């Protein structure tokens, strides 16, 4: 009599291993521990929660939604069960290692960032680990006004929390007299210390194999300091000099000079570490100092208070705690401003009026960039490199993201509408329908 197999993925473990769906390099990357089986409990927390076939397939199903058009994702999906089973087999045998992904520089409004794209073969177990162990274990220790990279929160919520804090401040003091301290960390992700990260996480996650998996991921972030002298390496290690990942290349197994600092922008583990790691700072400001009107979005934070001297003193405390964490405050972007003046937080302008109204508006640069983009689209359209329907879809998407926030930018939006209609000889009905039957 044939036995019924409940999970198709379990069949694939005994089958011949297939080649990786994407041509990523498995060399020069850290390996997992030799064994993952807990002899006391039978299975580790990783294997019982995060690395089951069901959990891994769900993780792949969730992460593929916005990137399904990519070739590597489609190849992985063709043999998803076999790829998952292959990973489970490699992890249990202690032969699994992370793959080297694509690296590139991204210019974001003139600021260059070094991005490391994690291959899909590694993104699946990392996503499952984050969803089932990492985030549930660390989220209870995060304050409510820490909104980055968490499900149910995000940048819109953080902007709204700033608005709520301004409104509550006015209700409490019946005035817009006061001050706001805005702070920022220099090269936040590049200078996160691996040992301090593991020490902080180990207080919240007790499973040995989960910690080993985190160490393996962190080790893959190491940079190559072979071109630096011993004195320079020591200065980087002790935090005397600030690390900039743009000046270093990725380390490999042959690299003798590495520093356990820095995490990649692009990995989900990095995002959660960035949210969690300064939690001591959040708790000190919120609980010890009693600052109700405080919020942090990754490396940007603010404190609203009536007393300027209080903010100056707490800034010194923040600097002391940051030095213990190995973080560096960017004093060019850290300042104290009067609350009745307009200030910018997360690319949004805030003004607390004398009547208690909070006026929110997008920065003018947002509309200038879109105007430049539309003029470039016009040239591409005339050269038949872009279709009119594609341009309409892009503008509708941008316009919807601006108008749904209900900011005070009505005139600027109308000016962009008029420019769009003039450039492409369209009417509002064409924008509303989203399709154009005109042949240019």
Task: Please give the residue ranges for each predicted region.
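Non-catalytic, polymerase-adjacent accessory regions of viral genome-replication enzymes
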Residues: 1-85, 435-440
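Right-hand nucleic-acid polymerase module
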Residues: 2, 30, 118, 123, ...
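Active-site-proximal segment of RNA-dependent polymerases
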Residues: 46, 133-193
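Short Gly/Ser/Thr- and Asp/Glu-enriched loop/turn motifs at secondary-structure junctions
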Residues: 99-101, 295-299, 332
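Conserved pre-motif C helix in the palm subdomain of viral-like polymerases
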Residues: 112-143, 256-286
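Conserved polymerase palm-domain catalytic core
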Residues: 171-298, 303-317
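A common structural junction motif
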Residues: 205, 319-327
